Design a protein with these regions (language model features):
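C-terminal helical accessory/scaffold domains
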Residues: 1-81, 86-87, 91-92, 96-97, ...
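Extended, compositionally simple hydrophobic/Ser/Thr-rich segments
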Residues: 82, 104-105
């Protein structure tokens, strides 16, 4: 079954009735089962396992591996173009710093530079700012401001985009708080504030981590350290 799941994500094709029959089961059930596993892991507050489970959910949905370029999720970009970017080993985050002409030069296709630049800036991305305040010796209040930093396109993003907000301990092993944040198209240019209450322990740790991860897009993640020093 693991091999079939890997083949499904890799978009491999099989010959033979038995394998094709098993692949139908994987196609129909894998995403649903993985979502259930993710919810179970999250209920136990296991941060690293939850991160891996959510990533695998998205790999199944997108039929691509996490190691691939996030640009593969834009179906209008030719695969050959994405492969060129992947072969460059150019970090996706650094593509934001390039203009259309520079992107065209990078892939040696000047005419496609503007289109690729547009897709890069349509990739779901949120900027984060936090304000913390102790409430009691064991409770901390966090006001998290989320600001969308991408260009909305109805054909790509629909009417809303979902994100998971995690507050993790200093070792990123325990989820101290989690909630689902739904960004609607109507408010895609506005700042949004989420108020959270999380436990604190003695001795006081140096910091917590806030991670905001897209529910559907591989590679869409923002991490904000919250220092207590």
């Amino acid at each position: 079954m693991i091999s079939l799941l890997q083949a499904y994500i890799s978009q491999l094709k099989f010959d033979g009735f038995a394998l094709m029959s098993d692949m139908v089961y994987v196609t129909q059930s894998a995403a649903r089962l993985m979502r259930a596993i993710y919810e179970m892991v999250l209920a136990h507050n296991w941060a690293q396992l939850a991160d891996k489970a959510l990533a695998l959910c998205k790999m199944i949905d997108r039929r691509m591996w996490q190691s691939m370029s996030p640009l593969r999720q834009f179906k209008k970009i030719p695969v050959e173009v994405v492969k060129k970017i992947e072969k460059k080993n150019f970090p996706f985050s650094r593509l934001y710093d390039l203009g259309p002409n520079e992107i065209g030069e990078l892939i040696r296709m000047p005419k496609l530079g503007r289109a690729i630049h547009k897709y890069i800036h349509q990739f779901p991305k949120l900027d984060l700012i936090s304000h913390i305040q102790p409430i009691t010796r064991s409770t901390l209040s966090i006001d998290l401001t989320l600001t969308p930093d991408f260009q909305w396109d109805d054909k790509i993003h629909g009417h809303s985009q979902g994100f998971w907000i995690f507050v993790e301990d200093v070792d990123s092993e325990i989820v101290l708080h989690h909630e689902f944040f739904l960004l609607k198209k109507t408010f895609c240019e506005d700042e949004h504030t989420v108020k959270m209450f999380v436990p604190i322990f003695e001795p006081l740790p140096p910091q917590y981590f806030i991670r905001v991860v897209s529910d559907r897009w591989l590679g869409s993640e923002t991490v904000l350290p919250v220092s207590f020093r």
